[in-house]
C-alpha cells in the first residue's frame, strides 16, 4: 500500500514503523522515513495508519494525537472495533482533525497490485479528499456512510 501511494500519488510519502525491515524497504524505494510518531504528525497532512488490531491502533493514535493540529486527516486502514473507531474519530475531531475508517479486504498480492477493496466510513467531503489517495492501492472503493460504517461493512464482509 505504501509503495503504491509513493509511486502513484505524486505526493511525498513518509513511512514510520517500529520494525526496521519495512523502513529499509521504504528507504530503498526513495521514500521518506520518520524517526517518530511526532515526526509523522508534524510532516504529514494526511496520515495513513495500518495496524494489526485495535490495541495497536489505540497506541499509535495516543502517540500521534498530541502532535497533530487542525486541518490534518487520519485514514485508518485497520480492522478495528466500531466503538473504538468512533471514539478515536471524536477525539481527533475535537482537535479539528478529520478521521476516516477505511479497512481493507483482499490479499497481500492485491495490496502489491493496487487492487484492494476498501470500505470507507467518513464524511462526504473527507471521502472526496482521500478517495484519490486510496485509489493508489485499491480499485474497489465504497463510501459506506459516516465514521464507523467502514468497519461495520468490513465485519459483514468477513462473515
Predicted regions and their residues:
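Active-site loop signature of alpha/beta-hydrolase-fold enzymes
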Residues: 21, 56, 107
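Short beta-to-alpha linker loops that shape the active-site pocket of alpha/beta-hydrolase fold enzymes
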Residues: 19, 52, 105
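NAD(P)+-binding Rossmann beta1-loop-alpha1 motif at the extreme N-terminus of oxidoreductases
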Residues: 1-49, 72
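Rossmann-fold dinucleotide-binding core
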Residues: 80-159
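Solvent-exposed polar/charged
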Residues: 7, 42, 66, 132-136
Amino acid at each position: 500500500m505504501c509503495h503504491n501511494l509513493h509511486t502513484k500519488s505524486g505526493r511525498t510519502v513518509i513511512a514510520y514503523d517500529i520494525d526496521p525491515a519495512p523502513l529499509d524497504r521504504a528507504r530503498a524505494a526513495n521514500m521518506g522515513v520518520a524517526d517518530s510518531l511526532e515526526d509523522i504528525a508534524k510532516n504529514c497532512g494526511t496520515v495513513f495508519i495500518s495496524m494489526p488490531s485495535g490495541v495497536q491502533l489505540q497506541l499509535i493514535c495516543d502517540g500521534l494525537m498530541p502532535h497533530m493540529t487542525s486541518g490534518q486527516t487520519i485514514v485508518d486502514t485497520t480492522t478495528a472495533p466500531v466503538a473504538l473507531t468512533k471514539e478515536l474519530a471524536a477525539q481527533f475531531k475535537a482537535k479539528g482533525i478529520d478521521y476516516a475508517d477505511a479497512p481493507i479486504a483482499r490479499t497481500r498480492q492485491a495490496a502489491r497490485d493496487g487492487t484492494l477493496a476498501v470500505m470507507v466510513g467518513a464524511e462526504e467531503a473527507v471521502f472526496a479528499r482521500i478517495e484519490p489517495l486510496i485509489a493508489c492501492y485499491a480499485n474497489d472503493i465504497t463510501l459506506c456512510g459516516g465514521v464507523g460504517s467502514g468497519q461495520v461493512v468490513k465485519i459483514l464482509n468477513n462473515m
